[in-house]
C-alpha cells in the first residue's frame, strides 16, 4: 500500500476510536485539513522507516506540532494551534496513549500485506 492510503486508514481508525470515546470532532479524511492529513502521513513514514514505539511516535508528533507553533491548552483549538496532548507521553491520559499504540499497529498490519 502507498503511504497516503495507510495514512487514510490510520486517520479513519483514529476517528472511529475518538467517536467511541465520545469525541465526534474528528473530520472524515476527505474533509480533514491538509495539516491533519500531512500529520498522519508523517506518522506513517516514521513507522515505515523503522520500529518507532508509541512514545517515539508521540514525541515526533509533538515535535512537528511545536515546529508549527502549537502550544498546550486543555481544549483543542486548531485555529489557535492549541492542543491538550502537547505534553510528554507519560503525562497523556491512557486513552490518548492508546492512539499511538493503535496507529502503530495499523501501520504495521498494512505494511505487512
Task: Indicate where each model-derived feature is located.
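Alpha-helical propensity feature that highlights long, continuous alpha-helices across diverse contexts
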Residues: 1-113
Amino acid at each position: 500500500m502507498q503511504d497516503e492510503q495507510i495514512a487514510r486508514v490510520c486517520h479513519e481508525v483514529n476517528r472511529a476510536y475518538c467517536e467511541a470515546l465520545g469525541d465526534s470532532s474528528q473530520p472524515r479524511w476527505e474533509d480533514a485539513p491538509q495539516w491533519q492529513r500531512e500529520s498522519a502521513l508523517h506518522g506513517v513514514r516514521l513507522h515505515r522507516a523503522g520500529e518507532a514505539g508509541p512514545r517515539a511516535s508521540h514525541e515526533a508528533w509533538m515535535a512537528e506540532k511545536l515546529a508549527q507553533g502549537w502550544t498546550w491548552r486543555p481544549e483543542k483549538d486548531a485555529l489557535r494551534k492549541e492542543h491538550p496532548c502537547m505534553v510528554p507521553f507519560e503525562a497523556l491520559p491512557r486513552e490518548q496513549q492508546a492512539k499511538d499504540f493503535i496507529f502503530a499497529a495499523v501501520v504495521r498490519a498494512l505494511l505487512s500485506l
